[in-house]
Amino acid sequence: FAAFYADCRHEVLPIASGYRLALIYNLIRVGEGPLPQAPDYGDQQTQLTRLLADWDRSGSLPDKLIYPLEHAYTEAEIGFAALKGQDAAAAQVLIPAAAAASCDLYLALLSVNETGWAEYSGGGHWRDPEFEIGEVSYSAWTLHDWRRADGSLSEMAALPFTEEELSPAEALADLEDAEVEFSEATGNEGASFERFYQRAAFVLWPSDRRGAVLAAGGLGVSLPALRDLIRRWEAAGATEGDAGWREAGQLASAIRAQWPQASWLVRQASSGGQSADLIDALLRLNDVEGAAEFTTERVAGGAYGPEDNPALAALCRRLAPEAAAGLLGQIITAHAFCRPGACANLLARCAAEGAIALPLLQGPAQLLLQGLPDDGPASPTAPQDYSQRPEPLTALQLAELITVLVGIDAALADQAVSFLLARPALYDMDSLLVP
């Protein structure tokens, strides 16, 4: 006979012969007397506190560490209060040690989701062939469903992780044993597989590395976290220089440092409003200089679209007039050819909201007129990248352009009208100019 506690890990194999009897008991402690006490882990806690406090000094550790747990937990039950056996004992040591060493500690679910191509192994019946894993084409390693040590939920989005962050290094040695679901070939698709593995884990990092950890998770993780930090800082009185302001500023700096580099991700950040979100966050933190630097590097020097204009106009209102006009000129010079409508709207916003005095807008307005798409021999060659080709002006955008030019300098407006009328192939009289 063999007996197990229900929450102990054990393996049950198919019966080769005979029968299996299962007797299930609920064990309840009765009677008076002192409750059993957990062992004293004071020495281990002291040692762990010292190791965590030396995290930054070692120089060899990643920004976060992941300690997978022994027992299985579902999304519904995961929580520090629900930990069992060795996991509860580990939490008893980790919680005070992390607090003493100024580390953030979370409980999360660790998931590995892999898909790819499967190969026939040559075994099995022709009606029920056997497969084996061939090539992994997609792999996602994420941490999600976060819980704090006080039992509260965290709204932090999923974070990616790597094997180098696991402690111990072989903690996921049983990943290869995870159940694999194979799908037979259909049509033009070959045989495929999907493997899903999930386990609970402690996740911790030094509090002063929080910004780097969140920024590494991508804009979908870091920007919501930044907005939450700023919201809490503003609710606490918005005192510039206090701990909340410094924490939000550190995260904003980390986001700037890890801004996407791939051109398609940069465009996605602009069209998705994430560039505008960061500019807005920097302005709320009174980091006008940082917002201007980001705009020069990532907007004028990267991707730009109409979604950026409200934040850019707000930035121009906070800058010195000459600096605002110069920044506006940089954006228009870089993007007037491909985004003429967005540039006209930004110019109109700055004029209407008084962000820049009208005399100072003459330079940016002239740059916009010079940068408009042209069908003449001096016209810039259309980029091979389709996403960077000129966006045709709409009738409303054209009306906005002429209106703002009239307000800035009537002579510029006359030049614009003459320019447009002379290029009917680009600026159709019936669909654009007459309306």
Label every model-predicted segment.
Residues 1-9, 15:
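Conserved metal-binding segment of the jelly-roll/cupin
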Residues 5-7, 24-28, 70-72:
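Structured loops at beta-to-helix junctions and adjacent beta-edge loops in soluble globular domains
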Residues 7, 18-20, 62:
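Eukaryote-biased feature marking scaffold/signaling PDZ-domain proteins and nuclear chromatin regulators
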Residues 12-13, 34:
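Short helix/loop capping segments that flank catalytic or ligand/cofactor-binding pockets
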Residues 18-33:
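A short hydrophobic beta-strand segment most commonly corresponding to one strand
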Residues 29-435:
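Intrinsically disordered terminal extensions flanking catalytic oxygenase cores
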